Amino acid sequence: MSTHRNQRVIVGISGGVDSSVSAYLLKALGYEVEGLFMKNWDEDDGTEYCTALSDLEDAQKVCDKLGIKLHTASFSAEYWDRVFEHFLDEYRAGRTPNPDILCNKEIKFKAFLDYAQALGGDLIATGHYAQFSRFGEHTYLMKGADPSKEQSYFLHAVPGQALARTLFPVGGLLKKEVRRIARELDLITHDKKDSTGICFIGERKFSDFLKTYLPAQPGKIVTDKGEEIGRHQGLMYHTIGQRQGLGIGGLKGYDDAPWYVVEKDLDNNELVVAQGGDHPRLFSAGLTASKLDWINGVPAKSSFSCYAKTRYRQPDQLCRVDVQDGGVRVTFDKRQRAVTPGQSVVFYDGARCLGGGVIESVFK
């Protein structure tokens, strides 16, 4: 077994099973391991929403069991400034953002990394299902081994310099293997439910949360032919491809086919819907994206073919990427369904994640 006794690793301990097993694996390899519990949200901390208090208790029990020290730190101010305000700005603009990606870039692999350095850490580690490959001076982000949990999509904006100081101990394992290890160690987190959704929203209704910060602007729901068939409470509560929660079922003069959101008309504050999950207006030939993050630098070629995802867990889609000033134009081999401005498009060369950007617009 290789040893790393001269290297101190600060593990982000969330109170979940993945980070718990990550800490164990690193200690077993001989690293000097300490944990850090990050608190990123201060607005409310009831157990029905964010579970920071119970998560901290679980994190402490895991560290006690493993015999490692647990530090705690609040990055709430950084989260508000660098992530949450951007989240609100995007919704004001009628887009659908993904705060987890920005949180990884700005908090988990920047604020946390800086804090870990101050603690004397040589490296950081997280429980993400991703891997890395090193070649010369470059560190490449690679897909995790478990296709059902693979998380490189959320890590595409993390710069290569940060990845070079990061370990992903469970990235080469399947989730069931991680739970088995935790169960054999009798860790309190071995059967803990995976966290889902955005932490600061938790299990509450999304529209109720958003109303707390942004005033609703009701408007018309219109068909793809321009006929008004209902009212919406705010475009920000809806996303492209949405079927549930429109409140327009059983309309006279229309068949029973389900309605889907195909456009958010910001100029007229209208929600445009069409019937059928395969309606042509749900599909796009390509997209434009900005705010590009290339993990290992801008590609040498201004035009190249690769694979891309426009949402988490989507199968890789073959495409052509044309690099332009300030962004890219992406043309897919096959038309893509429900491509959503504000979400991220992430590029791959096989198992290697190249980077990605924020979707600005689509073209049909």
Swiss-Prot record:
InterPro entries: MnmA-like (IPR004506), MnmA-like_C (IPR046885), MnmA-like_central (IPR046884), MnmA-like_central_sf (IPR023382), Rossmann-like_a/b/a_fold (IPR014729)
Catalysed transformations (reactions): S-sulfanyl-L-cysteinyl-[protein] + uridine(34) in tRNA + AH2 + ATP = 2-thiouridine(34) in tRNA + L-cysteinyl-[protein] + A + AMP + diphosphate + H(+)
One MF annotation (Gene Ontology) recorded for this entry: tRNA binding
GO BP, one annotated term: tRNA wobble position uridine thiolation
Recorded superkingdom: Bacteria
Known EC number: 2.8.1.13
Disulfide bond residue pairs: 103-199
Start and end residues of each stretch annotated as Interaction with target base in tRNA: 98-100
Keyword presence, Nucleotide-binding: yes
PANTHER family xrefs: MITOCHONDRIAL TRNA-SPECIFIC 2-THIOURIDYLASE 1, TRNA 5-METHYLAMINOMETHYL-2-THIOURIDYLATE -METHYLTRANSFERASE
Family from the record: Belongs to the MnmA/TRMU family.
The name this protein goes by in its record: tRNA-specific 2-thiouridylase MnmA
Species of the source: Hahella chejuensis (strain KCTC 2396)
